[in-house]
C-alpha cells in the first residue's frame, strides 16, 4: 500500500470534518464509533460517551463533541441500541438512494405540502422524516422511515411486508418479481409499481493537470487491475498511476467493477481506498498521478475522462449523455411498491419523486434528474464527424445515401435529451419511455407556432440494413402516435414527422445485449429555429 496516498486519504477526510467545524480523532479503542452525515460533510471518529436529548456525545483528542442525531448516523459496536421507530410509511433498500437522495427528496416533498420535514437519524443508515404542517409550526401530518442498506433489502422488505416502498439502484430481477407476484404483490414491472426517479453516472476522474482526457475500456481494465502502472503507457506523462478505489462493499465499487470486468474481477490492491465520493474526489484533485471514479456530482475540480468503448465510440460524462443514457457508466435509480398495500401517503410521495417538481432536489442531491435538455447538432458535432467517416466507408449506394440524409437532417435540427428505447424486434417502449412521454408533452406544449418535431428511429445491427430502416421508421411512427394520443390538443401548434435511419450512428457496441438495447431507440429532434 502506498503510505503517502493512505495519508492523503486520511488528510482529506480530516479536511471534510474541519469544514464542518469538527476534527477527526485518531484513537482506536473498543468503544470507538463513527458519526457520518448523509451528504458526507461530517465524518467523525471518537469514543462513545452517551446518547442524550437526541444528541450523540463522543470523546476525541479535542475533548467531548456533541452532535445532533438529526445530522449523523452512528456506526460501530458501541452505538446505542435505540428504540424501534414507528412511522406511517416505511421505505427500505439502496443506501445510494436512501442516504444520497432521500433527505432532500423528503424536504422537497414537504415543501409541496407547505410543510417542513424534520429529519432525525435514528440508527446507522436509518432516518425518520416527520412532516409538520404550516412550515413546521403546525401539526404532524405524516412520517416516513427510510432504512438505507442495500438493493437486495428493498425487495426482501417488500416481500416480507415490512416496507411500503423499496429503493434500488438496479432493476428488479425476474426471480424477485416472480417471488413478489406469488405473494400477491402484483406485477412489479408495471408502470404503477416500478418508478424511475433519477439517473446516476459514474465518472472516471484524474488530476486537472493530466493531459489524458480519454481512455478506452481496455486501458481502464489495465489500470484498475494493476497491469498499466504508468501514465506514459496511455499517452500521458512519465508518472506512476495511483489508483483510488472505493471500499469493495460499496455499491459504487460493485457497479464500476462490474462494468469493467463482470464477475471475473482482478486480485489487485489499489494505492488508496476512499470511504466515499467526496474523499475520492479530494484525493484525486491533490495527486497528479491519481485516478478514481465518483458520482456525477463529485467531479468538482478534477478532470472527467471520456470513456471509449470496444467499438471506438466515445462517451463523454456530461448531463446530456447521461439523460439519453448513452454515457457508458449510467444506472437508473428506482422506487418500487406492491399493488396490494399501497396507501395514500406512499403514493403521494412516489408521485412527487417522479414529477418535475422533484427535479431540483434530485439535482442538488448529486443525481441527474429526468428533465429535458436541448443540444445543437452542428457539423462540428462529434456524431456528425463520425457519420461523415461512416459515409466514406460505404460504397456509393443505398447505405451511403441514408447516412448523407441523416447528416442533412441534423444540420436543421437540435436534439432533445428525451430518448425512447425498445426491446429487440419490438415497438413496445421500455419502462422509462412511459414516463418520458408525459414529460415530453409538457415540454412541447410551450413550443412556438410552426415548430417542427421529428421522431428519429434507430435499430441495432440484427437483420438486414433495409429491414432495419423500415423497423426504425415504424418505431418512430409508433412514438409519434403515442405522443399525439397523450397530448391531444395541447401540442396542436407543432408539425410532427417521423424518420428512420436503421443501424447507422450506433451509440454503443452491437456485440453485447446491453449495447444493442442502447441502440434500439427513437430520438426527438426539434427545428433549430424554434425555442421551446
Where is each model-derived feature located?
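Extracellular interaction modules
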Residues: 9, 61, 520
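Periplasmic OmpA-like peptidoglycan-binding domain that tethers envelope proteins to the cell wall
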Residues: 133, 139, 148, 153, ...
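Gram-negative bacterial Sec-dependent N-terminal signal peptides
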Residues: 2-28
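Short, surface-exposed beta-strand segments enriched in small/polar/acidic residues
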Residues: 93, 415-425, 437-476, 496-508
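Structural motif
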Residues: 332, 450-452, 519-521
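Exported/periplasmic ABC-transporter solute-binding proteins
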Residues: 32-435, 439-448, 492, 532
